Amino acid sequence: VAPAQHLCGSHLVDALYLVCGDRGFFYNPKGIVEQCCHRPCNIFDLQNYCN
């Protein structure tokens, strides 16, 4: 499992594409930026944003 890390901007979007794949994801900038850019998050946090 990847360690928690800060993901911002295009890095965050790229990570969502990798984690969610064909399911896609709903991009809620306020929630995910707060969770993954301002604080470190992990792959399980990212999966919460997949469709």
UniProtKB/Swiss-Prot annotation:
Per the record, the major location class is secreted
SMART domains registered for this protein in UniProt: IlGF
| Family matches, as InterPro entries | Insulin (IPR004825), Insulin-like (IPR016179), Insulin-like_sf (IPR036438), Insulin_CS (IPR022353), Insulin_family (IPR022352)
- Pfam families named among the record's database cross-references: Insulin
Q: Biological process (GO) annotations?
A: glucose metabolic process
The disulfide bridges present are 8-37, 20-50, 36-41
Cellular compartment(s): Secreted
Q: May I have one GO cellular component term? A: extracellular space
Q: Please tell me whether the keyword Transport is annotated for this protein.
A: no
Q: Which GO terms describe its molecular function?
A: hormone activity
Q: Which UniProt keywords apply?
A: Carbohydrate metabolism, Disulfide bond, Glucose metabolism, Hormone, Secreted
The record's function comment reads: Insulin decreases blood glucose concentration. It increases cell permeability to monosaccharides, amino acids and fatty acids. It accelerates glycolysis, the pentose phosphate cycle, and glycogen synthesis in liver.
What is stated as this protein's family in its record? Answer: Belongs to the insulin family.
Partners and quaternary state? Heterodimer of a B chain and an A chain linked by two disulfide bonds.
Entry protein name: Insulin
What gene codes for this chain? ins
